[in-house]
Amino acid sequence: MTDASSDTLAAQADAVTAADCCHEPHSDCHSDLCASVDHQPVPAGTASPELAAGLPRQTKVRAWEHVGSLVRPTADQLPPPPERIHRRWDRFVRLVGDRGVLRLLASHVTVFGLGGVGSYVTESLARSAVGRLTLVDFDDVCLTNVNRQLQAMPGTVGQSKAALLAERVRAIHPEAWVDPVQAFYDLTTSDLLLSPQPDLVIDAIDNVTSKVLLLETCVRRGIPVISVTGAGARLDPTQVRIADLTETKVDPLARVLRKELARRGIGAAGAAGIPVVYSEEEVREPEVPGWDAESGFQCICPHREDSPHACEKRRRIYGTASFITASFAMAATGWAVRRLLEPTAAN
């Protein structure tokens, strides 16, 4: 945790699922599941600027709600820390102590990707007294998100995932400072989205190119990060695990991440220390819905014409379940909270 965030409380404070598929599988990935994830060619190189030529991704950025432009609030613009802990944290204080809650209230976490995993991560962080949250997702709610994303309901289709989750956080944790931003994470937005530098990042991005860039950036900047891999095509939450990226089993996406990070000069030593949430359950092949069998696949997502993940671009769409994505999210959030509490764990 940075000294600035320890001193200043931001008092207003799917994941890569197997269902997110694309038409352009990675040349080095032979798994059907991994080929279904959104890969873009990622150029070799050891420094982030060298990635520029290989990231011709469409970027959609909307202004931060609190400031009306792409300018982040400074420490002196944030409300002062509370003098007393609110009784809404009574049961949590009894678990982690006054000092633990105060530390979490002074913490800043950025969540990238607000789908089936990221939405549950966000709510759990809010209910764990994290004082400042930056919520990043370029997408709007689709009707097909309802089965697994907290902010997705029939009445919210077409609305910003980030803005909807921010409303939910404020209802739970009124003193939290929440930055909802609708943007696609890539080389052109990386510096902005990580400024000011958060105390911790949770990666629930559903695009491999962006995912690799985020992990590389966090490693190089020394930002603690936990990454979530494939939460789709599974039914057994008891198979969810946390391990170092170098030690995962079964998961094909983790293999791709290891290889791409190594191409950037982040080899075994660099990858060690990147915890990932993954499943050891074998992938389930997707069933064919009756409506697909009758009339072929038809995308019903809003604003799909300018989406980097329009369904028409996907080779295969895997199934998802909320009890799996939520299990991934709880594992990631638990790790994050424990990491934020480490300096006070012995007290």
Model-inferred region functions:
Residues R263, A329-E342:
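Internal hydrophobic alpha-helix adjacent to the cofactor/substrate pocket in enzyme cavities
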Residues R127-R132:
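Conserved S-adenosyl-L-methionine
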Residues T2-D14, D20-T110:
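N-terminal charged helix/coil linker that caps or initiates catalytic domains
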Residues T188-P196:
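Short amphipathic alpha-helix with an adjacent loop that forms part of the alpha/beta core around
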Residues F112-G113, V136:
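Conserved N-terminal Rossmann-fold NAD(P)-binding element of oxidoreductases
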Residues D137-H173:
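Glycine-rich phosphate-binding loop and adjoining beta1-alpha1-beta2 segment
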Residues V117:
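Hydrophobic/small residue at the entry helix of a nucleotide-binding pocket
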Residues T2-D3, L200-F323, S327:
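E1/E1-like adenylate-forming module used to activate ubiquitin-like modifiers
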